[in-house]
Design a protein with these regions (language model features):
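Non-catalytic accessory regions of SAM-dependent methyltransferases
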Residues: 1-43, 47-50
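A general structural signal for well-ordered alpha-helical segments in protein cores
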Residues: 8, 27-28, 58-59, 68-71, ...
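Residue-level signal for inorganic ion chemistry
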Residues: 30, 68, 98, 125, ...
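Conserved AdoMet
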Residues: 32-108
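Conserved beta-strand segments of alpha/beta enzyme cores
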Residues: 84, 137, 161-163, 257-260
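Conserved SAM/SAH cofactor-binding pocket of Class I
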Residues: 96-194, 198
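Mobile active-site "lid"/loop adjacent to the S-adenosyl-L-methionine
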Residues: 186-216
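Conserved Class I SAM-dependent methyltransferase catalytic core
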Residues: 212-275
Length: 278
């Protein structure tokens, strides 16, 4: 029988040889998930002898990682803000940049409490906002029925109330909101081919690809958004690197004005907020 500590070393080396970033962290995460161990259990069980069935599950997880599948998709979860979010191949992995969007919405809510999450995916934005804003009325829409199943599962898991329903952007929406949030597809054609394999092959393309210039979704949203925002309503969008001026122009052409732009940890413009004037 192999010991846990030796197994971690061997699996780490496999991942390192493959050229994966942070191989030891990945190996530990996957092995803990395979054995249902939390970090404390892991420390206490490093001399544990592993049976054949345990080794088989570990090998299965490591083999998937060697094919560049993200750890979160293998173990089926990722932490976002302070919540555990279930993820699978039908939804985009929640990313740290999107936590900035949450932060800025929370800073600017005041009495604005009806919120729409456009293209909700896993539901992470709507669910965190619901957990922080209590009695707010929050809707989340997506064109993908499979993504909506994931979003509802996450809402139930985190004990929050969000109304999720299918809509192609605004097609099935019949009311106005104080706040609209969205992390739309914004990867351009030239950027898409350069994406890491873990993103390009394991996140849904519909949640990534924003057309030739990456701006198609913003144009579609901008054409209708004024009709779905209350007066003085705010809209928060995640944007791609170098897209600030183009995205702002798209929304200004539809009668919205800039409130602010915020940077991510790499000092790239990442979140833009626009307003519907009264």
């Amino acid at each position: 029988m192999a010991q846990l500590i030796e197994t971690v070393k061997k699996q780490t080396e496999k991942l390192r040889i493959r050229g994966l970033y942070n191989p030891e962290k990945d190996a530990r995460s996957l092995i803990c998930a395979a054995l249902n161990l939390d970090p404390v259990d892991y420390i206490l069980c490093t001399n544990k002898n592993l049976c054949d069935s345990e080794m088989s599950k570990i090998d299965s997880f490591i083999d998937r990682r060697l094919k560049f599948e993200p750890v979160s998709k293998i173990i089926g979860k990722r932490y976002f803000w302070d919540l555990e979010i279930f993820v699978d191949s039908n939804v985009l992995d929640p990313r740290p940049e999107s936590e900035i969007l949450i932060e800025k919405v929370l800073e600017n809510t005041s009495n604005k409490r009806s919120i729409l999450d456009l293209g909700t995916g896993s539901g992470c934005l709507a669910i965190v906002l619901s957990s922080k804003l209590g009695q707010s009325e929050i809707d989340g829409i997506d064109i993908s029925k499979e993504a909506l199943k994931v979003a509802r599962k996450n809402a139930n898991k985190n004990n929050v109330q969000v109304n999720f329903f299918q809509s192609n952007w605004f097609s099935n929406i019949d009311k106005k909101y104080d706040i609209i949030v969205s992390n739309p597809p914004y990867i351009s054609k030239s950027e898409f081919v350069k994406l890491p394999r873990g993103v390009k092959f394991f996140d849904p393309g519909i949640a990534l690809y924003g057309g030739e210039d990456g701006l198609v979704s913003y144009r579609i949203i901008a054409r209708s958004i004024v009709s779905y925002l209350n007066d003085e309503g705010l809209a928060f969008f995640e944007i791609g690197q170098g897209q600030t001026n183009a995205v702002l122009k798209i929304f200004e052409n539809q009668g919205l004005s800039l409130v602010s732009v915020w940077k991510d940890l790499d000092q790239n413009n990442r979140i833009i907020c626009v307003k519907k004037d009264a």
